[in-house]
Amino acid sequence: MGLLQDYVIIVTGSASGIGYATSSTALREGAHVFGVDVSPLPADLCDHPNFQSFQGDLTEDSTAQAVVTACTQAFGNRIDGLLNVAGVLDNFASVDAVTDQIWNKCLAVNLTAPVKLMRAVIPIMRTQKRGSIVNVSSKAGISGGAAGVAYTASKHGLIGVTKNVAWRFKEENIRCNAVCPGGVLTNIGSDIDRESFDMEAFETMKPVQLAHMPDQSKGPRITPEEVAQVMIFLVSGLSSKVNGAVIPVDDAWSTI
């Protein structure tokens, strides 16, 4: 029997990267997974009998509630876990260079969308008197020197929300935790406008980046699967008293 046997969980960003790895791992652990992404979902997930999908833009006003409604229609009026994985990166712009477009997009995807999904699932979790929420923050959520101001603000904000939700609903057996991955090979940066990349700001952060990945030719140190394993632990009963935690998954990068 798997760690998540018969759990019903929602995973955002399921089409690739950490979201895909988390969805795949959860299915292997026996969960019913409702995957959400703005992009088409992979066939290997969609072909699994315990997987249902929703393709939509989480920044649109009605999408969060539509996701929760569709999940309950697919798997019944029960949601054991919400894993907010979907995110976007900025262009490393500092506060004197960030555009409204970059700022608004980072806040909408990385902070507002997870809040709306939490708002939509909490009533169900309160009724069933249990639930686990896991939010994907970042090294940039606990540091000022790992990304641009928009991404940094959005991920710091998500940690604040995580702690608030954990404290507010702890007496109702609803937990909320965050993970802070280090450098992971995903497509999160694929839509960055390279022409607006703030190289001057990035140069000031290079020592921080090199401390984590001294040999850039070897690529990121952390795999999506390694982050997924921590998220599965946090949504499972093994972590029943872990609540309001912010857990780095970065091979000690967070220590500096």
UniProtKB/Swiss-Prot annotation:
Binding site for NADP(+): 11, 57, 119, 151, 155, 183, 187
Practical applications according to UniProt: Compounds in the chrodrimanin family such as chrodrimanin A or verruculide A exhibit strong inhibitory activities against protein tyrosine phosphatase 1B (PTP1B) and therefore, they could potentially be developed into drugs for the treatment of type 2 diabetes or obesity. Furthermore, chrodrimanin B, the end product of the pathway involving chrodrimanin A or verruculide A, does not exhibit the PTP1B inhibitory activity, while it functions as a potent blocker of insect GABA-gated chloride channels.
Enzyme Commission no: 1.1.1.-
Gene Ontology BP terms: secondary metabolite biosynthetic process; terpenoid biosynthetic process
Entry-linked InterPro entries: NAD(P)-bd_dom_sf, Sc_DH/Rdtase_CS, SDR_fam
GO molecular function (one): oxidoreductase activity
Reactions accelerated catalytically: 3-hydroxypentacecilide A + A = chrodrimanin C + AH2; chrodrimanin F + A = chrodrimanin H + AH2
Metabolic or biological pathway, per its Swiss-Prot or TrEMBL entry: Secondary metabolite biosynthesis; terpenoid biosynthesis
Function comment: Short-chain dehydrogenase/reductase; part of the gene cluster that mediates the biosynthesis of chrodrimanin B, a meroterpenoid that acts as a potent blocker of insect GABA-gated chloride channels. The first step of the pathway is the biosynthesis of 6-hydroxymellein by the polyketide synthase cdmE. The prenyltransferase cdmH acts as a 6-hydroxymellein 5-farnesyltransferase and produces the hydrophobic metabolite verruculide C. The FAD-dependent monooxygenase cdmI further converts verruculide C into verruculide B.
Listed PANTHER family: DEHYDROGENASES, SHORT CHAIN (PTHR24321), ESTRADIOL 17-BETA-DEHYDROGENASE 8-RELATED (PTHR24321:SF8)
Protein name, per record: Short-chain dehydrogenase/reductase cdmF
Naturally occurring in which organism (per UniProt): Talaromyces verruculosus (Penicillium verruculosum)
Lineage: Eukaryota, Fungi, Dikarya, Ascomycota, Pezizomycotina
